[in-house]
Swiss-Prot record:
PROSITE patterns: HTH_ARAC_FAMILY_1 (PS00041), HTH_ARAC_FAMILY_2 (PS01124). Keywords: Activator, DNA-binding, Plasmid, Transcription, Transcription regulation, Virulence. The gene is virF. The keyword DNA-binding applies. GO terms for molecular function: DNA-binding transcription factor activity; sequence-specific DNA binding. This is Virulence regulon transcriptional activator VirF. Transcriptional activator of the Yersinia virulence regulon. Gene3D superfamilies: Homeodomain-like.
Length: 271
């Protein structure tokens, strides 16, 4: 079983920044309040909450003056496949949900989950313990989530993660979303007919390809806007928008302000 690199993070970002994830995983909010956004929804994570998210890019903001502290637990495909195989008989008792998995799931931490997290943190502080103990604690955590009130949705998401065509699509889209292709070209380059491509895309992302591509480009442009000195028109072109005016409209619709206002806010915040 693959070794898992669990990371303790400290964030202090009062404005939305883009966080990219190449793996699926769990966030445990130890302190503070964090807002996560995808293309269709905002998720507010409070202290004492846990968040499961699928790989991809999200806009994230810390909602408190003090830095937020989080624990990030990556869940590689090989680890999840082993977990599902090892506990397949037990997990088969949970009702199946065949709907499209949600990209994010928030869990309230119950007393038993809290105890499990404390045990995991205690092991992480001991460098003399074998890594298998960490893996066992994570498996315990996953089982508790699977048998929680949202266990059906959680397990549905885990089962989809082991689907190879879906993993291949995610990798393909992350590598090519900036291409100026028509949708039929995306499907052809992926090796599918347009209808089949749309169906697979809906299963993986729960939204249309056009909506996902637009969201991904906006997040990429947002990252450029806040972290480099490129002009707004150059950022619009770099992110695949046909014009600066279209980019400005899309950005305002997504973040509630113009690109110029966002850049000024960034300057005022960071000094």
């Amino acid at each position: 079983m693959a070794s898992l690199e669990i990371i303790k993070l400290e964030w202090a970002t009062p404005i939305f920044k883009v966080v990219e994830h190449s793996q699926d995983g769990l966030y445990i909010l130890l302190q503070g309040q964090v807002s996560w956004q995808n293309s269709s929804q905002t998720y507010d994570l409070d202290e004492g909450n846990m968040l499961f998210l699928r790989r991809g890019s999200y806009a994230v903001r810390c909602g408190t003056k003090e830095p937020c502290q989080l624990l990030w637990i990556p869940l590689p495909g090989s680890f999840l496949s082993t977990f599902l195989h090892r506990f397949g008989s037990l997990l088969s008792e949970i009702r199946r949900d065949n709907s499209t998995p949600k990209p994010l799931l928030i869990f309230n931490i119950s007393p038993i989950l809290s105890q499990s997290i404390q045990n995991l943190c205690a092991i992480l502080e001991r460098s003399d313990f074998p890594s298998v103990l960490t893996q066992l604690r994570i498996e315990e955590l996953l089982l508790l989530l699977a048998f929680s009130s949202q266990g059906t949705l959680f397990l549905s998401a885990l089962r989809h993660l082991g689907n190879r065509p879906e993993e291949r699509l995610q990798k393909f889209m992350e590598e090519n979303y900036l291409q100026g292709w028509k949708l039929s070209k995306f499907a052809r380059e992926f090796g599918m007919g347009l209808t089949t491509f749309k169906e697979l895309f809906g299963t993986v992302y729960g939204i249309s390809p056009r909506a996902w591509i637009s969201e991904r480009r906006i997040l990429y442009a947002h990252q450029l806007l806040l972290n480099c000195k490129m002009s707004i028109v150059d950022i619009a072109m770099e992110a695949g928008f046909s014009s600066q005016s279209y980019f400005t409209q899309s950005y305002r619709r997504r973040f509630g302000c113009t690109p110029s206002q966002a850049r000024l806010t960034k300057i005022a915040t960071t000094g």
